[in-house]
Amino acid sequence: LKCGVERLHNRPAFAYNGSMRILTAAEMHACDERTVEQWGQTWESLMEHAGAAVAGFALRQFPNAVRIAVLCGKGNNGGDGLVAARHLEASGKQVRIVLLAAPEQLQSEPRAMYEKLPTALRDSVFVLHEADPALEHFLAGTDLFLDAIFGTGFHPPMRGAAVGMRDKIAGLAAPVLSVDLPSGWDADATAMHTDGAFRSDAVVTFTAPKLAHVFGGLTRGPVVVAPIGSPEGAVISTGNLTWTGVSKKIMEVPRALNSNKGRFGHVLVVGGSPGKGGAPAMSSLAAMRAGAGLVTAAVPRGIAAVVAGFAAEMMTLLLEQSSTGGISTKNLDAERVEAMMHGIDVLAVGPGIGREPETAEFVRQFIAKTTLPAVLDADGLNAFEGHAEKLDGRGRMLVLTPHPGEMARLLGSTIADVQRDRVATARDFATKHSVTLVLKGWRTLVAHPDGRVAVNTTGNPALAKGGSGDILTGMVAAMVAQFPQRVAEAVECAVWLHGAAADAYVRTRDEHTMLATELLEHLSEAIRAPMERDGVVWLQEGQ
């Protein structure tokens, strides 16, 4: 049975061929203006598409909600809510509308949408000016709230009747679906906060994500982006911020039937030290799971048996060890290096390698002596503390995967300095050193040498566990090995899949319990999860 939304509207499809841009509020408004002025849309048609998208998502995401209360402000966000209310009512839902302004105070397009409401629904609208004891009775039995009070044009703080409404629904059990943004949020927010905003269980935004959608932590529920008719040419961003999720498309093309392991690359994981044999083993296993054709772990002789026992599919290469059991500079002999590189496509250097001075010297010289694509992580990065100038990606492909502490050591600064402006930190280092830099943490960033930065929106606190970084290192190396001509997409895809596997884990188990290797059990699920379904792009799946 088709819902009223589908009967009444042929919703537009996405027109994006490249990465989805992340916009500021001003850029979003300019996009809407270009869509109207240059592509022949009307403001009313954009509002119709937006409201229809919200109603469609509400029907699919909250199918058991019968009594739906739609909370509308006087601006365009309220107009989107009025359109959604009309379609939900047409789909058989019991809809109640609360207006935070008198009908005659509505702006022009929202007023037009108000006039389109069926007479019975329009006549039952509750107009809220200030606290009203009748409101509680009006909202009794609500199964779902649609928050359409304030959108991208709002600037905190929130005042007036909206504050009372926020406080009223804060203690109610019914979920809240936010239209564009939870009311009270600034669309340009780049830090997590919840002060003063409506609670939210899901968010539907339009055309492209805004800064708050990727950096704000608006909800633990899903965040989706719906098309409303703006073509790609209308979406212009000066911030050069994109989203990692669209790079997942490189994994959606089936492998050729006549494929062989040689077509998918050979990864050499260089790492390990006494007590840290698990790190290169996990990276190697992750590289295999992520699709590399062959994987070899190059580790000190003393831990080779431990590493080799981790997975039967993994090959090992024994390296000469120092007096303390780490990797020795003896392995830098030209013949040894040439033998190590034979048949290898991508290097992953650093997992469990330790911080012994001799091993750090090995890492620096090894990277200087080789020209293969290389992924550097953990103590492979710490080896360049005080030597960051030697990390030069000109003439070869280098991917660095630091957490904030490792990034601070490379820069000779502090974690607080790194975290103060993560985007600028990542972008500046990537462009200066001609590397691809994966700055891990809340909303992991992938910064490219050309200045573009992709923001990742998958992942959750289950990843705050030793070994998850080693898994990511192996996945990044495997993706680069499989897609050597599409390195930017390969790295972004690996980061997205890493987080998506953790999201898949917590859908059935608790985030406290995940082991790093359990990520790999959910990797197939992450690969098969479509970026776009039900007519919307899933920026965040929710937990």
Question: What do these predicted ranges mean?
Answer:
Residues P133, A140-P157, L347-G354, T444:
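Glycine-rich phosphate-binding loop
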Residues E130-P133, L181-A187, L211, G380-F384:
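Short acidic loop-to-helix transition motifs that present clustered carboxylates
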